[in-house]
């Protein structure tokens, strides 16, 4: 796999839209995957024998233009590949504000303080653990609406797919979602790579 942290971050600036406002959503099985509200990690695991998270990079960085309008400070950016039986299926990019990381955490005055702080620290200690396991297992984290976007074949993510020996014949589709945690929000974007699209569209 010809990918290193040297090129991190891979994310590119793009406008995201509500699915109801896009007429060009793919008329295929991929559309259902884009709009599914459950954990993508759990769903991917049902389509392979071995699921793996490959970390491309993670660091405190400035978000891209218009990527996280509510944030004026650097955020924790984590980019990974979700791989099924050794094949990268999904590029995932997560943006976590410092209020969630704990560096600007308020002084909580209740019995849940220790639990909250431990949960915040988990985001920077994930390693190869899927973020979805944390997002969908905590009763304190509430998922928001799904937005979608179409990535051009000449963009950075298409170049990433090409470096993974996946031919990009058409634009890539992705989705993103805000997750709410104790008054703060983090963003998770998931872009389906060509290998995933080929498999999904061939499935019944």
Swiss-Prot record:
GO terms for molecular function: chorismate lyase activity. The gene is ubiC. The keyword Coiled coil does not apply. PANTHER family: CHORISMATE PYRUVATE-LYASE. It catalyses: chorismate = 4-hydroxybenzoate + pyruvate. This is Probable chorismate pyruvate-lyase. Pathway: Cofactor biosynthesis; ubiquinone biosynthesis. GO terms for cellular component: cytosol. Removes the pyruvyl group from chorismate, with concomitant aromatization of the ring, to provide 4-hydroxybenzoate (4HB) for the ubiquinone pathway. Its EC number is 4.1.3.40. It is found in: Cytoplasm. Belongs to the UbiC family. Substrate binds at residues 78, 131, 190.
């Amino acid at each position: 796999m010809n990918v290193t942290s040297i090129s991190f971050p891979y994310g590119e600036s793009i406008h995201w839209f509500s699915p109801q406002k896009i007429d060009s959503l793919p008329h295929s099985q991929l559309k259902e995957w884009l709009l599914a509200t459950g954990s993508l990690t759990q769903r991917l695991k049902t389509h392979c024998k071995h699921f793996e998270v490959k970390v491309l990079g993670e660091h405190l960085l400035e978000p891209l233009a218009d990527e996280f309008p509510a944030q004026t400070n650097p955020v924790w950016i984590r980019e990974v590949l979700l791989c099924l039986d050794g094949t990268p299926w999904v590029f995932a990019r997560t943006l976590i504000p410092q209020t969630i990381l704990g560096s600007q955490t308020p002084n909580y005055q209740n019995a849940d303080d220790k639990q909250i702080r431990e949960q915040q620290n988990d985001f920077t200690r994930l390693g190869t653990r899927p973020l979805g396991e944390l997002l969908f297992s905590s009763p304190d984290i509430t998922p928001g609406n799904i937005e979608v976007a179409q990535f051009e074949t000449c963009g950075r993510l298409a170049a990433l797919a090409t470096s993974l020996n996946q031919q990009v014949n058409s634009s890539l589709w992705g989705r993103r979602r805000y997750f709410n945690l104790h008054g703060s929000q983090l963003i998770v974007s998931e872009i389906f790579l060509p290998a995933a699209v080929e498999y999904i569209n061939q499935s019944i």
